[in-house]
Amino acid sequence: MAKTIKVTQVRSSIGRLPKHKATLLGLGLRRIGHTVEREDTPALRGMINLVSYMVKVEE
């Protein structure tokens, strides 16, 4: 079974770069406090790295 990680949005996307907003939507995050569980892949890690200042990650 693939390893999964939990990603939670902790800061607002208002006033952020359009690319960063699109990345949050790509992660499946819609609002502050929203948590999603995703398969841990290099592509996902790259997305998280881009918006690391707006999300919290749990292994």
Swiss-Prot record:
Biological process per Gene Ontology, one example term: translation
Listed InterPro entries: Ribo_uL30_ferredoxin-like_sf, Ribosomal_uL30_bac-type, Ribosomal_uL30_CS, Ribosomal_uL30_ferredoxin-like
The keyword Ribosomal protein appears for this protein: yes
Pfam families attached to this UniProt entry: Ribosomal_L30
Keywords per UniProt: Ribonucleoprotein, Ribosomal protein
A single GO cellular-component term on record: cytosolic large ribosomal subunit
Gene Ontology molecular functions: structural constituent of ribosome
Xref: Gene3D superfamilies: Ribosomal protein L30, ferredoxin-like fold domain
Transcription in keyword set: no
SUPFAM superfamilies membership: Ribosomal protein L30p/L7e
CDD domains (UniProt xref): Ribosomal_L30
Protein family according to the UniProt entry: Belongs to the universal ribosomal protein uL30 family.
Record text on subunit structure and interactions: Part of the 50S ribosomal subunit.
Protein name per its UniProtKB record: Large ribosomal subunit protein uL30
Organism: Buchnera aphidicola subsp. Acyrthosiphon kondoi
